[in-house]
Regions:
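Hydrophobic membrane-insertion alpha-helices, especially the h-region
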Residues: 12-27
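Structural beta-strand segments of beta-rich domains
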Residues: 50-54
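Short, isolated positions within intrinsically disordered regulatory regions of eukaryotic proteins
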Residues: 15, 30-33, 133, 137
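Long, low-complexity serine/threonine/glycine- and acidic-rich segments characteristic of extracellular
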Residues: 6, 38-40, 45, 55-152, ...
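N-terminal Lys/Arg-rich, disordered targeting/topogenic segments
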Residues: 1-9
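A cross-taxa feature marking solvent-exposed loop/turn segments within ectodomains of secreted
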Residues: 32-34, 49, 63-65
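Aromatic-capped interface at the extracytoplasmic side
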Residues: 24-42
Length: 160
């Protein structure tokens, strides 16, 4: 009789644990997803003139976008071109925005950059719980060349 009560109690606790642990484990597994946000940059040329518009398409299908940051770096000087934070749908749901498109106007001289090599940086994060709720991060750097001066033509001789 006593062993039958222990057996029933054991099975009751085991089934109760499965009912709680399996859904909780599945939910944690989905919130701790490791898929990084994707970036599609439409930069026509790595050579930047006086003014140029380029577009970015960023997406994260699973947990939603948290932040998009774009900056230009040259000789230790950095200018923020775009910084956008996306809203959360709630602690348990992730982000409201899963895909967005952004057009960025880039004018190096207005930002105080002279001609030469520079780096275009992008940082995108999502609402995954990975990294102690910091999310997955996509970090890219693209080497660009700032060239704002038009070419000059000099006449070498009048003999031709």
């Amino acid at each position: 009789m006593r062993s039958e009560k222990k057996s029933r109690k054991f099975w009751f606790i085991a089934i109760l644990c499965l009912i709680i642990v399996l859904p909780a484990g599945w939910y944690l597994w989905s919130r701790l997803e490791k898929e990084k946000p994707t970036l599609n940059m439409n930069l026509l040329s790595p050579h930047l003139g006086q003014s140029q518009v380029f577009s970015l398409v960023v997406s994260d299908a699973k947990s939603g976008l948290r932040r998009l940051w774009v900056g230009l770096l040259k000789n230790g000087q950095e200018a923020v071109l775009h910084d956008e934070k996306f809203p959360s749908a709630g602690f348990f749901k992730g982000g409201k925005v899963h895909e967005t498109s952004v057009k960025i106007q880039l004018a190096p001289e207005v930002l105080g950059f002279s001609d030469g090599d520079a780096i275009l940086r992008t940082v995108i994060s999502d609402y995954s719980w990975r990294g102690w709720w910091k999310g997955n991060i996509t970090y890219t750097e693209k080497n660009v060349k700032i060239d704002t001066r038009p070419p000059e033509i000099e006449v070498l001789s009048r003999a031709h």
